[in-house]
């Protein structure tokens, strides 16, 4: 997908808050903006 594996890791290895859609660090347990605990991994497959 990305040209460099470092860039791909930086873009895809994040967690997404299911309430406010904020990007959070991979080690997060709750959202940095709204403190919601429902986080999911960012989808690695393209949706097209």
From Swiss-Prot:
Keywords tagged on the record: Ribonucleoprotein, Ribosomal protein
Keyword Ribosomal protein in annotation: yes
Entry annotated with the keyword Ribonucleoprotein: yes
Signal peptide range: none
Stored InterPro entries: Ribosomal_eL40_arc, Ribosomal_eL40_dom, Ribosomal_eL40_sf, Ribosomal_zn-bd
Gene3D superfamilies hit by this protein: 4.10.1060.50
Recorded GO MF terms: structural constituent of ribosome
Single GO cellular component term: ribosome
GO biological process: translation
SUPFAM superfamilies linked: Zn-binding ribosomal proteins
Disulfide bonds: none
Xref: NCBIfam families: PRK04136.1
UniProt family annotation: Belongs to the eukaryotic ribosomal protein eL40 family.
Protein's recorded name: Large ribosomal subunit protein eL40
Gene designation per UniProt: rpl40e
